[in-house]
Amino acid sequence: MKKILFAASECVPFIKTGGLADVVGSLPKCFDKRYFDVRVIIPKYLCMSKEYTDKMEYIDNFYMDIGNDNKYVGVFKMEYEGVIFYFIDNEFYFSGAKPYGDLLWDLEKFIYFSKAVLSALPVIGFQPDLIHCHDWQTGLIPVFLKERFHNGDFFRNMKSVMTIHNLKFQGVWDVDTVRTLSGLPDYFFTPDKLEAYKDGNLLKGGLVFADAITTVSNTYAEEIKMPFYGEGLDGLLRARANDLRGIVNGIDYDEYNPATDKFIVKQYNARDFRKEKVKNKLALQEELGLEKDEKKMMIGIVSRLTDQKGFDLIAYIMDELCQDNVQIVILGTGEERYENMFRHFDWKYANKVSANIYYSEALSHKIYAASDAFLMPSLFEPCGLSQLMALHYGTLPIVRETGGLKDTVEPYNEYESTGTGFSFTNYNAHEMLACIRNAERIYYDKKREWNKMVDRAMAADFSWHVSALKYQELYDWLIG
């Protein structure tokens, strides 16, 4: 039995701000229980829902030296859907209204968390063969493991894996502050260890000291070795290329399943989508005040409204696109200029564009079910989950070929009748518009071809079980 511990800053269903929480919450329950004992450890935030905190059972507490201080560490435990979760409790650090705040404060609390995770293991009596760390918040775990803990028998052969969910966030502050907060000796603050461009960098520490590095898609694993995507760490990632692999995220098919989805008006599956899916479109057109027309192509967008997601491209061609015979439904929040741009087009083309500048889980499900196509022209996209949801709902993605989008959406080839979506290569607004118009042409002129693509899209398997098998291979390789 191999014992694995996931360490992260957030996890579904306890606390969520982004895709990281989905991975940490969904992946552990998909491992083969006969060979893998996978548990999770996260901070016990005060802002967690009471329905979970009331069920947590107190295990123990102790005091730990960190920096120049001696800090309280409480440990709680709870079983959820067959997986054991541990929680590190300290109200001084984890009492805010949301999990992240000011960067310097985040830095201090996650340095504390990284050390507390290792210090708590002997107390809870769980001795993992491998600790799987996620993003910069747990970047110091591999460092502490090598520096402070490897002398004792308990930690001697413990391995670590570092997973990059988004390389843009690295946990960077000046060297003196990081040295003081972490209590690490000067030896660790050199350019081949934690120092990057004269600053202390927590993620870099994890990438240098972990036994293996993974990221959330094959293409992204290749891209981050180049300066454009490497965020200043491309040299290190090239040096560690043999230990770096990409494993695509999955989605939870229990939650995102058009056949059982409780948010949508008409449930459907791969056999009956030809006549049932359109009922969701008519219902959404009515709900959002768009022109009711089941034949009109609907393009959905569910996203954070930021540059990373390609909204500068959409801004360039939105007026042109609105001349076409399409409807566009947007859901999300983000940069003010993009929020206002969509509000403007909602006003200008009231029966064609619906801008919903907020976030609603229910509406997102309705958009996945009602739309014919799903637009996602990202500048970079480590994995992306929206296109996987769209595929499963039979809504064909229109994407830029980058990161996980390139790995998961097979572009349509009209000569071979293959593909599950449409893609373009260069980050260029009119290349994107040409791609959208190609999709319109197939939708209006070759509806049978379109429906065959929907068949292939709904049959594609991006469940967590597929990802879990790849992680099991990685663990076998590391632990032996």
Predicted regions and their residues:
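Catalytic cores of nucleotide-sugar-dependent glycosyltransferases that transfer UDP/GDP/TDP-activated
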Residues: 1-480
